[in-house]
Amino acid sequence: MNHLDKNAKKSLGQNFLRDKNIINKIVNVFNIENEKVLEIGPGQGDLTKELLKKAKKVLAFEIDKSLIEHLKNEIKDLHFELRDQDFLNVNLNDDEFKDYYVVANIPYYITSDILLKIYRSFWNFKGIVLMVQKEVAQRIVAQKNSKNYSKLSISSQYLADVKIEFIVNKNSFIPAPKVDSAVISLKFKDNIDKENLEKMLKFFLVCFANRRKKLTFTLNRNFNSTKVKLAYEKLNLSDNARIQELDVSQIVLLFTYLN
């Protein structure tokens, strides 16, 4: 254990991945040979170094000054670019991010923020491989009628083909987090309506606002009740239906009929 391990900052969600086997598996989820890779929170550079063996460029975002200093000293590869910048403040719509893969062991406390940030510029990215909490991974891939089914499930599955690649034991990290993790992959779909993306994401949020109540309760407060009734008839939905009983395709159709 080095001084950076000992001084890992809980406030930044720092858990350094040291398991070489897991790192190699992450690097090989997608074929990143000669591809551009964006890394969020490179930490001490263990994953970064392996990515650089395959990728033609690795662009990393880090905000911890001590880690930035370490990375500058540790990695001299010309294909590596390190930015002292909060990823959540980056404009991902910029053309410079076109055709990147995102591969990262991210700070868990901002997982949803990171995902939604990428989702809002999904067309620039070829795919995502992220280390997340196991519980979050289960929410992302959850199907209807599951207790884990949520707006994150719908948003993720609407935009991408999602998969839990493998589970990672908490002891693969220094310091070890309290829970196990999972590596997820997302490959974005080609047929997504970019123009209505914000409206769609907001609709998912609205639908899950009162998940214990009938969905009509929420919809009638946000849409014309006649439109809601007609949409239900077209989809052959019961008035008693709750959001967790509808799959992604039904929710997307519901959005279409209401708009």
UniProtKB/Swiss-Prot annotation:
Its EC number is 2.1.1.182. InterPro entries: KsgA/Erm, rRNA_Ade_diMease-like_C, rRNA_Ade_Mease_Trfase_CS, rRNA_Ade_methylase_Trfase_N, rRNA_adenine_dimethylase, SAM-dependent_MTases_sf. Keywords: Cytoplasm, Methyltransferase, RNA-binding, rRNA processing, S-adenosyl-L-methionine, Transferase. GO terms for cellular component: cytosol. SMART domains: rADc. It is found in: Cytoplasm. Signal peptide: none annotated. GO terms for molecular function: 16S rRNA (adenine(1518)-N(6)/adenine(1519)-N(6))-dimethyltransferase activity; RNA binding. Transmembrane segments: none annotated. S-adenosyl-L-methionine binds at N15, L17, G41, E62, D86, N105. PROSITE patterns: RRNA_A_DIMETH (PS01131), SAM_RNA_A_N6_MT (PS51689). It catalyses: adenosine(1518)/adenosine(1519) in 16S rRNA + 4 S-adenosyl-L-methionine = N(6)-dimethyladenosine(1518)/N(6)-dimethyladenosine(1519) in 16S rRNA + 4 S-adenosyl-L-homocysteine + 4 H(+). Its main location: cytoplasm. Specifically dimethylates two adjacent adenosines (A1518 and A1519) in the loop of a conserved hairpin near the 3'-end of 16S rRNA in the 30S particle. May play a critical role in biogenesis of 30S subunits. Belongs to the class I-like SAM-binding methyltransferase superfamily. rRNA adenine N(6)-methyltransferase family. RsmA subfamily. HAMAP family: 16SrRNA_methyltr_A. This is Ribosomal RNA small subunit methyltransferase A. It comes from Mycoplasmopsis synoviae (strain 53) (Mycoplasma synoviae).
